[in-house]
């Protein structure tokens, strides 16, 4: 990799999937643009991928677009987080010519002030930066015991079945990814449409040799609105775990029995816990 090229001015696109985020979307967009104003090296663009929200999300974004041409909006049917990211990645690469793509939640749970840290590590030669809740310094202060338990078990299964034990937080939604790797992705393999797309994506990037680095983040509660994570997303995530092993044959043979049994145990625990606790994003 040409390290000198990493120090040039980058075109950075922030892909923000939305569905009924009228309470949050304007704030996160303004926070991102504020980070651009705080530096003079790179150019930012923001792409909102809206799944036909039934609230005022689209109208709010269109109003912001009228004031700032760095903001873009594409819409489509509600098919899940993974489908939204696939469409967003393609637009960011083909239409916006992005060098670097950020994944961020649109609900205010990710601290935009950390954006410069992500960019600095990319310019040092890393390919993927993950905002991690599960390395030293990372925190989840608002997680209930059940939510933290489910998240850690899910991550453990992905790490070992997928053969990416070096990654501590496989389901984090706060990432920066060099588009040179996204261009190589086999989206037919990444067939998951829901939140399990996040774990499939990071496994695929690792298998392709991407240099992945994690930085600690504090993952706080959403600022407004309701969580979009449904039971079907949790089930898809669990059922997708054994599939990750087929792209990593050596580790799959070693961990397949553990992974398969873990999926069903995890699914049973999830069903039990959801009767008594609020379970949200993995």
Place the predicted regions along the sequence by residue:
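Acidic helix N-cap motif at the loop->helix transition within catalytic regions
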Residues: 23-27, 55-64
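Donor nucleotide-sugar binding loop of glycosyltransferases
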Residues: 21-24, 53, 81, 111
């Amino acid at each position: 990799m040409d390290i000198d090229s990493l120090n040039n001015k980058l075109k950075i696109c922030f892909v923000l999937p939305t569905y009924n985020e009228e309470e949050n979307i304007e704030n996160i967009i303004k926070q991102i643009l504020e980070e651009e104003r705080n530096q003079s090296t790179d150019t930012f663009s923001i792409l909102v991928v809206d799944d036909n929200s039934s609230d005022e999300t689209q109208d709010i974004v269109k109003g912001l677009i009228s004031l700032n041409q760095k903001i873009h909006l594409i819409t489509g049917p509600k098919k899940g987080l993974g489908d939204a990211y696939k469409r967003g990645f393609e637009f960011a690469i083909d239409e916006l010519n992005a060098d670097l793509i950020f994944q961020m939640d649109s609900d205010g749970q990710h601290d935009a002030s950390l954006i410069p840290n992500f960019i600095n590590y990319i310019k040092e030669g890393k390919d993927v930066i993950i905002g991690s809740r599960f390395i030293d310094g990372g925190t989840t202060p608002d997680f209930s015991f059940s939510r933290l338990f489910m998240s850690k078990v899910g991550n453990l299964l992905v790490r070992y079945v997928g053969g990416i034990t070096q990654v501590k937080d496989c389901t984090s939604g706060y990432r920066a990814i060099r588009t040179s790797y996204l261009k190589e992705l086999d989206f037919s393999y990444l067939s998951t449409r829901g939140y399990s797309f996040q774990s499939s994506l990071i496994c695929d990037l690792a298998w392709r040799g991407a240099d992945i680095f994690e930085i600690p983040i504090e993952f706080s509660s959403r600022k407004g609105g309701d969580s979009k994570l449904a039971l079907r997303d949790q089930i898809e995530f669990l059922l997708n775990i054994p599939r990750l092993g087929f792209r990593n044959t050596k580790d799959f043979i070693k961990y397949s029995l553990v992974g398969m049994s873990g999926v069903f145990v995890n699914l049973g625990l999830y069903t039990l816990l959801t009767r008594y606790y609020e379970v949200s994003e993995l």
